[in-house]
């Protein structure tokens, strides 16, 4: 038997050689559509779609591996069957008379989703390894999960325009979901919008050469979100525990029959501007108030449950979005277009039911604070004389202010609300160039003002607590002698007061600029291709994630929130040939 580990640690190269994993998915999709014109302006149509997939997932741990050795080899097979049916039936009316244009739609929609997951695991494989479960002697576990989801909707909408200047629309839908109890499953949602194209007005014509387009937009409405759990309103039971030698059911989740739709009330004001028939600008301001906010609320452990899915309160999002598109240069042989977009959003919890605040993982949900506010001890740096990690105690005085006394014992430091992970601004910058038979385009993405928490820091930055685990390159900056000024404490074997304690030390900026994509293409001249009977020929190079500047580069800056051991996005290069006949 080959030795897989040193001091109970993995030999990752040999582990990859002897273990096995594969996943295979078969997917089929189909659509059937029928339409009939009842009259010239009245049309009825039906669309039925089916989306089916079957996934087979197998994982084998060899007896030669560290984990597999415990079981003398272990195999796990998982098969997942999914099917979604969707039916949409529409009645559409449209009519234009004079300068007036009217259209109306009524619809009835049904969605049904079935999910089945089958799982089995066995151990004790023979010497001549055949990795199928049939070659393992002893069962470990088996399980089956069945889930269903259904949604029924009644929809109606009306659109009106006059003289390509005035526009108005109204929509209404009534949705019923199996995820909610019969008393709360139906929700009514609607929206109203209007716009005015001022550039079509007679008094704007003198400015037409400069102000080629000007449009005001406004909308208000409410839509709904469903809980992620299919059975959140029902208490569920699991059979698996044994009592007196017989399997017995136990209540695994607590249901909430009062669970209802999460509702978003949104107001949007927009302005579209066209300049010189060359530059187009869209500016939007929005505010969205979420009521009956869906969240899992922590429960007292005496209840026997850790949390309860419920409608906990209200939250407000406010922001602006800007988009600019420009045809910078356009000649016979050369063109250059640019697109730039920017978004800014901030949110705040307005109200929480029962409690003014509660902790949810690494976040605190607190009235008056952003929804994704990190809640941790506050790191105070390193003592330059001893190399010990320092923390602010953050005890609240009689005025509610936090004290900032530095302590070396993390147990004496209280967690407080710290950073909001949401970026202040984010967006993209795109350019496209065409010169005769050459085309070049690239896309830059950017984000500033956001933060993330490195959940892997308790291993990579533990300052000696686990000496065999891999460490971050920041250890090169660690404190080594009295007088050293650094933010990385000394490395102490078995350290129990270091980075393995969660603190703001592991909060990092997600500021970055990234060359998201680049495409360079060459098109063969038409005269060459006509002789060969080819309509078009193009060779190209494309790349993604080619360059990144990041304020913190130890993991992907596009990952926000709580970041763990995740696979970063790939940097890809591709060469291709396109032929059209």
What name fits each language-model region?
Residues 310, 329-421, 452, 461:
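Conserved small-residue
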Residues 23, 27, 68-167, 220, ...:
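Outer-membrane beta-barrel transmembrane domain signature of Gram-negative proteins
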Residues 232, 236, 312-317, 361-388, ...:
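C-terminal beta-signal and terminal closure region of outer-membrane beta-barrel proteins
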Residues 138, 177, 447-538, 543:
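Extracytoplasmic gating/loop element in the C-terminal half of outer-membrane beta-barrel translocons
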Residues 1-3, 7-14, 59-74, 114-142, ...:
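Surface-exposed loop/turn segments flanking beta-strands in extracellular/periplasmic regions
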Residues 16-19, 28, 137-155, 241-280, ...:
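Outer-membrane beta-barrel signature, preferentially recognizing the C-terminal barrel domain
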Residues 26-97, 101, 149-181, 185-200, ...:
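Surface-exposed extracellular loop regions of Gram-negative outer-membrane beta-barrel proteins
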Residues 15-20, 29, 33, 70-79, ...:
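Extracellular loop and loop/strand-boundary signature of outer-membrane beta-barrel proteins
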């Amino acid at each position: 038997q080959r030795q897989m580990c040193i001091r109970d640690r993995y030999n990752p190269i040999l582990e990859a050689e002897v273990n096995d994993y594969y996943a295979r998915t078969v997917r089929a999709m189909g659509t059937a559509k029928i339409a009939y014109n009842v009259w010239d302006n009245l049309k009825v149509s039906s669309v039925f779609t089916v989306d089916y997939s079957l996934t087979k997932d197998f994982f084998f741990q060899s007896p030669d591996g560290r984990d597999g050795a415990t079981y003398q080899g272990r195999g796990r097979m998982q098969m997942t069957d999914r099917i979604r049916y969707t039916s949409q039936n529409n009645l559409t009316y449209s009519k234009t008379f004079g300068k007036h244009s009217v259209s109306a739609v009524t619809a009835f929609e049904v969605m049904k989703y079935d999910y089945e997951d089958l799982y089995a695991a066995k151990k004790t494989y023979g010497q001549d390894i055949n990795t199928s479960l049939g070659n393992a002697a002893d069962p470990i576990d088996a399980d089956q999960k069945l889930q269903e989801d259904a949604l029924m909707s009644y929809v109606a909408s009306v659109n009106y325009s006059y003289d390509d200047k005035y526009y108005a629309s109204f929509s209404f839908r009534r949705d019923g979901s199996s995820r909610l109890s019969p008393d709360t499953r139906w929700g009514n949602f609607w929206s109203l919008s209007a716009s005015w194209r001022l550039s079509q007005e007679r008094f704007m014509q003198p400015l037409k050469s400069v102000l080629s387009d000007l449009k005001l937009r406004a909308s208000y409405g409410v839509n709904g979100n469903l809980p992620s759990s299919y059975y959140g309103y029902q208490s569920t039971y699991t059979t698996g525990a044994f009592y007196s030698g017989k399997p017995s059911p136990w209540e695994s989740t607590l249901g909430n029959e009062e669970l209802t739709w999460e509702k978003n009330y949104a107001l949007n004001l927009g302005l579209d501007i066209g300049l010189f028939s060359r530059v187009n600008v869209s500016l939007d301001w929005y505010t969205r108030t979420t009521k009956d906010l869906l969240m899992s609320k922590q429960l007292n452990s005496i209840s026997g449950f850790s949390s309860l899915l419920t409608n906990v309160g209200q939250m407000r999002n406010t922001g602006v979005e800007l988009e600019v598109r420009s045809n910078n240069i356009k000649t016979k042989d050369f063109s250059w277009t640019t697109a730039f977009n920017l978004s800014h959003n901030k949110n705040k919890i307005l109200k929480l039911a029962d409690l003014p605040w509660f902790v949810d993982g690494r976040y605190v949900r607190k009235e008056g604070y952003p929804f994704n506010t990190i809640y941790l001890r506050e790191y105070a740096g390193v003592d330059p004389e001893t190399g010990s990690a320092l923390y602010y105690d953050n005890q609240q005085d009689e005025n509610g202010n936090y004290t900032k006394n530095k302590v070396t014992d993390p147990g004496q430091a209280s967690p407080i609300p710290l950073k909001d992970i949401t970026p202040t601004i984010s967006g993209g910058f795109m350019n496209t160039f065409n010169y005769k038979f050459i085309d070049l385009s690239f896309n830059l993405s950017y984000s500033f003002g956001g933060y993330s928490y490195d959940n892997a820091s308790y291993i990579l930055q533990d300052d000696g607590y686990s000496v065999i685990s891999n460490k971050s390159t920041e250890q090169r900056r660690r404190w080594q002698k009295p007088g050293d000024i650094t933010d990385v404490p000394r490395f102490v074997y078995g350290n129990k007061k270091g980075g393995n304690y969660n603190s703001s030390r592991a909060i990092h900026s997600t500021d970055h600029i990234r060359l998201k994509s680049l495409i360079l293409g060459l098109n063969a001249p038409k005269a060459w291709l006509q002789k060969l009977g080819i309509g078009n020929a193009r060779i190209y190079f494309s790349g993604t994630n080619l360059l990144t500047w990041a304020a913190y580069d130890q993991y992907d800056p596009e990952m926000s929130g709580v970041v763990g051991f995740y696979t970063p996005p790939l940097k890809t290069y591709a060469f291709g040939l396109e032929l059209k006949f």
